Amino acid sequence: SESAAEKLARVRAAMQEKGAAHHLISSLDDIARLTNLRGNDVSYNPVFLAHLLIGASNATLYVDDSRLTAPAREALAAAGISVAPYEKAADDIARLSDSLLVDPAKVAASTLQSLKGTVPVIESVNPSTLFKSVKSPADVAHTREAMIEDGVALCHFFADFEARLARGEVLTELDIDRMLLEFRSQRPNFVSPSFGTIAGFNANAALPHYSCLLYTSDAADERCSVE
């Protein structure tokens, strides 16, 4: 897979093409992918709260320093990325004088407004966002592996689900949620679900993105909708 240093080199080449001296990235998925780091600050997403400011020869990750592990610090240092407190980002950005590349769709409106009139702003899609649209062989292989592992977990779940119903057990939507998590968590490299389980029966099955709670969980049969 591509190293963080190699990814930064591609971003800097794109910055040069656009005439940008600096590039601010606030979208968490872009930052995680560029740095090859993962976190759990947002439910169901392997991202962490941060800003990334990239220059022609330097880069700074604004993040809660206490959250970084020793291997993460070493990886950042190897890629030439320094670390600064998350709250320091606004001050450092305000001190910029050269052109700054930002994606207006992926930066806070307040940040964009504060830059107007203080620094030449180049508005364009984050280069890293475009890079993500082209999957590497490793990306494709890992996606296939994840789908296979999830398929195995689902096969185990459906077999257990049907066997329990055949024995006359009464299963609620909440039971199904717990069963799915149990089988998925047994697969290699499991981290977390990608979204909350949607297990709905009767009227609940008609609710988009329904999430069962203890007091709403209905008894289910083979007609239960599961996502």
Each predicted region: which residue ranges?
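Internal maturation/activation junctions in enzymes
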Residues: 194-196
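Flexible, glycine/threonine-enriched loop-and-boundary segments that flank and lead into catalytic domains
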Residues: 181, 198-214
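Terminal domain-start leader segments
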Residues: 1-173, 178, 185-192
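Single conserved hydrophobic/aromatic residue that forms the stacking wall/gate
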Residues: 215-227
